[in-house]
């Protein structure tokens, strides 16, 4: 009979749940292994077939590690705050909490149907007050450490969108919201900010401590953007007490500076704009406020700008340089001011060409007739730097600046502090009170969690504040002395819960602390973290930042949270495009589980190709995987679903070599997460097993253990058919005998007069005389030696017989 996946999979899922098979308890006498998936956002669409790929990979590792004697922590939870739930609630009038919980229930059912070995007792949900109590508590530690502060930040403000709201850079196109096409303006708004820049160097340096893809490390380094250079001070003409500070990585080009550019929002713009240029500057500032940072810094964008009417003095040669404003300079980067060297920077070159500003050559032999030159060479027109290369000239100029109090060496970062507030309802409340006397205080720790109030009115306030500003009985507070204050109405971003959730899994029911020292010391760090490459920068950077803060506070034992990171590839539609509802190419795993079973889906997704590569969904491949599942079943089970008689204790040795080869290769490939090649070897073993009359039970048990991480339901059923009463989960992983891998036969090449005439199989280490006789007796060789005089025979044992015949 065929393998009945519906009955067998339900049977074993019920068994695992009833027996809490995958429950992880702290056991200091046992080595641990912590395998973690990036927890999902529980969307209304439910799982698609891309989710199980990463989940199956961590499950294979978890199941193998348990069998290798490790105490495995393998949890699952929900990153459940998010804008889609709020938008759905606004559209339908339903509460986002109810919508989210319904989605979580659906996700959980789908995940459980796939047989993953999660410890469900450790499930976390970022929207649960018992969880976000500790998100708020960590925020309070950041605040006490001076790492959380309020600041006026330029944001994208859409006054006509959703009643007036802030939108992200990615939601802006051509000065309008992508959804609805509402006008967007740049305006300063009070925001909470986390000082991630204080950890910039450590976030770069500690990448050396982890086993991550080099591409991800490089993306993080580039995002942080550490650059060494100098700050240069340019005194303003007519007001020498006012100086414009500029950061440059090329202090050696100071002699080539021909103008200075300020961002339109830079704090000195109004002060430096002369009356005759005021109208023009104000108009330009208003136009710039309609563009996002992404649009403004597009290298292909036509350069725009206006002159302020003021000048600065170049400290190195006393030249007057005009001060312009242009939107290609951002107030949020560096000091919001740049010294423009058109001969060495293409953006400056384009700007200078458009506005007819001087372009001064400073590198000998550089052709600047068509564009800027940023290569090395000897300096010219550069005073005391003439004749020096770039490296030497940089250092000499920095020395000069420091000696003349005109500047100093400086390290700058592309990384900006993390804007941590959102003008939304559906997020963690920030535990802060603003008192009428102008002071700010944290909600006392013993009053946490500060719960999100229930309200039917989650419409944007229209003022830029979050909808929480509308909940007056929640917002207004009084202390014991009658002092009035207002609660912070901004909420935390969705990144907050995911910046520490892996720590909560180690001790999820602790009401006294986010996790006990004992649990953290035992389970930390995460040994394997698997998720999509789209989180290569922000989530991983924020998580590392919070972890390092907690490390500095003595609350976690490791500098880094995730030791090994793997990014699984994307499962594309059969048309090689990304799966999406709009393209109609989404495959629902529920349908696959119903038709073929979870083991088939798991097998297929691990066999599609290397885990890190993106591959298209292929129904033929899925059908082929199911055929192999049935083939494995028939190998061991007869038509009455009983173990075949040829599975016995008799071992004639015919499978010994291939069995040991399979144990070795599958173990090594699983460890390297090369699941597709491990499955190929399992297929080789099954093919060989079908060729023999007797199936030694010890080999069959070992084989079933090896398929258990990928096909756990079938493996459990087959294990029970061997008469075993315990789950296969904790059975010892099979080992191989190195002696059985030794080749007992070799292929010898036979050459006659330098040309290969035959390849002969013979026993390994056959002596020279016998090898010579076998070679000369070979029928094909004799065609080239008959009637000839054998002058010489050279034998290289186990490799070659070389015959010289005349």
Curated annotation (Swiss-Prot):
Record-level GO BP terms: leucyl-tRNA aminoacylation
Chief location: cytoplasm
Group of enzyme by EC: ligase
Gene3D superfamilies in UniProt: 3.10.20.590, HUPs, Isoleucyl-tRNA Synthetase, Domain 1
EC number(s) reported in the record: 6.1.1.4
Span(s) of short sequence motif 'HIGH' region: 40-51
Keyword annotations from UniProtKB, A to Z: Aminoacyl-tRNA synthetase, ATP-binding, Cytoplasm, Ligase, Nucleotide-binding, Protein biosynthesis
Listed Pfam families: Anticodon_1 (PF08264), tRNA-synt_1 (PF00133), tRNA-synt_1_2 (PF13603), tRNA-synt_1g (PF09334)
List of residues binding ATP: 581
'KMSKS' region, short sequence motif: residues: 578-582
Subcellular localization: Cytoplasm
Gene Ontology CC: one annotated term: cytosol
Ligase recorded as keyword: yes
Single GO term (MF): leucine-tRNA ligase activity
UniProt cross-references to InterPro entries, sorted A to Z: aa-tRNA-synth_I_CS (IPR001412), aa-tRNA-synth_Ia (IPR002300), Leu-tRNA-ligase (IPR002302), Leu_tRNA-synth_edit (IPR025709), M/V/L/I-tRNA-synth_anticd-bd (IPR013155), Methionyl/Leucyl_tRNA_Synth (IPR015413), Rossmann-like_a/b/a_fold (IPR014729), tRNAsynth_Ia_anticodon-bd (IPR009080)
Similarity comment: Belongs to the class-I aminoacyl-tRNA synthetase family.
The protein's name: Leucine--tRNA ligase
Organism: Limosilactobacillus reuteri (strain DSM 20016)
Recorded name of the encoding gene: leuS
